């Protein structure tokens, strides 16, 4: 028995369980949340991470999130400069996409503690615009911040290709919670986001890329060609890349 392999798999399962319980995803309809100050970076509650999606049916955290080299990103950028349309489309699939996270509590579910909400570019820009507005300012302030209404509409409900998330920052100022002990617990008992997403080494990501490019299959060439054609077709259909990534990331 390969004990190291067993330990690695156990760690993967524990990481997945830990992530699930510490992430929040809006459900269809309206919910109210509060964005909290982030314990591990009190100057900025928003955490920008980059991910490779859909490689070998998995999502991988890119080291470029932390300013470190990433072989998949390097390969994607080389493909972009090849002048070949199919390789350019493959590069778009391979390159890392940004997803922003913020620590939040959900109104009515405060007992569940702090969770991380991950959202796309549109929601991120709206939140930054509100905070930059002097009439609103720091919406995360423990005493005079503001709650945020989040509305999630499924693709079926909207008749669009992708689900839609919209936000409205409430005008009334209010504390995160009234109880001081509960407030302290919410501000101090926060995970570091890097505990939820495992960063693979340069060598491990190289193996991921090689597996994606050269799947262990008798029909390797046919499968790779099909993947490239699929990427081209999908890219032609996608008008809102951010919305598309939101849908894929949340599956």
Place the predicted regions along the sequence by residue.
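Compact mixed alphabeta submodule
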Residues: 107-229
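OB-fold ssDNA-binding interfaces and closely related basic DNA-contact patches used
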Residues: 1-135, 203
